[in-house]
Each structure stands twice: as structure tokens, then as C-alpha cells.
Amino acid sequence: EAGIECDCGSPENPCCDAATCKLRPGAQCADGLCCDQCRFIKKGKICRRARGDNPDDRCTGQSADCPRNRFHA
């Protein structure tokens, strides 16, 4: 939905204001495999292990989402 930055279901979430569904001041993210303590995880950190010989998925440092590498189906 427009204007919603985070899931405001839990008032205990330190990253998200439950009343406005907006990130709290200073927060970059509220959840996601590449979000830790309201901040994006640094670029290159493994967020999803690959199977077989494919490379692991790694955080970009610019998003809370863990991008799928091009080798994953």
C-alpha cells in the first residue's frame, strides 16, 4: 500500500512506528534477510546459502532484501 514503509503489526518492533507504519528515525529497514538492528547488512554478507556449486546469495548493502543470484531458478 502507498505510504507504508514497514509492517506495523507489532508495537514492539524497534524499527517501525506501529501508529504510522513508517520507519522510525534513523532506521533503514525493519525486517528482511539483509536487515539487522534497523540497518542494512554490509555488502557481501551471505544471506542465503546456495546448493551445489552455485554461488551463495549476498546482501547488497543497499536493501533489506536478499537478492537471488542469477544461477538460482
Swiss-Prot record:
Disulfide bonds join 6-21, 8-16, 15-38, 29-35, 34-59, 47-66. InterPro entries: Disintegrin_CS, Disintegrin_dom, Disintegrin_dom_sf. Keywords: Cell adhesion impairing toxin, Disulfide bond, Hemostasis impairing toxin, Platelet aggregation inhibiting toxin, Secreted, Toxin. Pfam families: Disintegrin. Signal peptide: none annotated. Expressed by the venom gland. GO terms for cellular component: extracellular region; plasma membrane. It is found in: Secreted. Monomer (disintegrin). PANTHER family: ADAM A DISINTEGRIN AND METALLOPROTEASE DOMAIN (PTHR11905), DISINTEGRIN AND METALLOPROTEINASE DOMAIN-CONTAINING PROTEIN 28 (PTHR11905:SF32). Inhibits fibrinogen interaction with platelets. Acts by binding to alpha-IIb/beta-3 (ITGA2B/ITGB3) on the platelet surface and inhibits aggregation induced by ADP, thrombin, platelet-activating factor and collagen. This is Disintegrin molossin.
